[in-house]
């Protein structure tokens, strides 16, 4: 039974529901920038704090544990920001999202994040043990094992998933135009580099966050420009 307001009341309710629909903030692309900066800071701290050779006992004894611990503490926050970045990309795709490539895009992003956390957890465990019995741990070879496992997971498997994420994202971009074509082709080239690098290039992990930084900066600029229009 309709109230005195009748159809007018129903229309007002419908309009109210439309107005309350959640929308992505225009500044949400900051999440990708935050991810890039946090991950690059973490990688730089680790690279400059640990000896290049895991068998170098003297180098391990001079490790600045506090710097490495800080680097590892940044990783979870980088991961949270990356999830927001994925959400921003999906929001820009909207109804044009291709189910096949979107599945690869989303799955590779989650696998990248899982392996990033895994490598950070292994490194964190080794560093924690180092704080309890440094000399015994270095001599036992546990440090070398932990370092090699962390290196393999981060530089081989994590980077492969980053490459797949880049390829699927750039393919979606070429189909939908969410960012310029030259950025997509650059992403393809960088993704191939990550897939073929086989962990042989020490600074290769920086490629992915730099690419995310480029894409996020473009999206943020486009969103803010649209907001001022």
List PLM regions with ranges.
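Exposed boundary/loop context
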Residues: 1-5, 22-25
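Short, Lys/Arg-enriched N-terminal segments with co-localized hydrophobic residues
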Residues: 3-14
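Hydrophobic, aromatic-enriched alpha-helical segments typical of multi-pass transmembrane helices
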Residues: 14-229
């Amino acid at each position: 039974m309709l109230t005195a307001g009748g159809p007018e009341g129903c229309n007002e309710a419908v309009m109210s529901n439309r107005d309350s629909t959640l929308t992505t903030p225009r500044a949400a692309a900051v999440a990708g920038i935050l991810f890039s900066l946090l991950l690059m800071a973490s990688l730089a701290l680790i690279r400059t704090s640990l000896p290049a050779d895991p068998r170098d006992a003297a180098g391990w004894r001079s490790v600045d544990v506090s710097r490495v611990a800080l680097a590892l503490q940044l990783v979870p926050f980088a991961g949270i920001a990356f999830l927001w970045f994925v959400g921003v990309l999906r929001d820009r795709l909207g109804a044009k999202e291709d189910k096949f490539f979107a599945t690869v895009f989303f799955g590779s992003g989650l696998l990248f994040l899982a392996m990033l956390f895994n490598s950070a957890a292994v490194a964190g465990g080794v560093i924690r043990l180092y704080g309890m019995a440094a000399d015994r741990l270095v001599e036992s070879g546990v440090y070398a094992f932990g370092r090699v496992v962390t290196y393999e997971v981060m530089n081989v498997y994590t980077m492969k998933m980053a490459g797949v994420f880049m390829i699927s994202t750039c393919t979606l971009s070429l189909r939908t135009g969410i960012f310029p074509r030259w950025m997509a082709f650059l992403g393809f080239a960088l993704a191939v580099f990550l897939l073929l690098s086989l962990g042989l290039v020490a600074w290769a992990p920086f490629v992915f966050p730099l690419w995310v930084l480029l894409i996020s900066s473009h999206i943020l600029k486009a969103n803010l420009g649209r907001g001022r229009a």
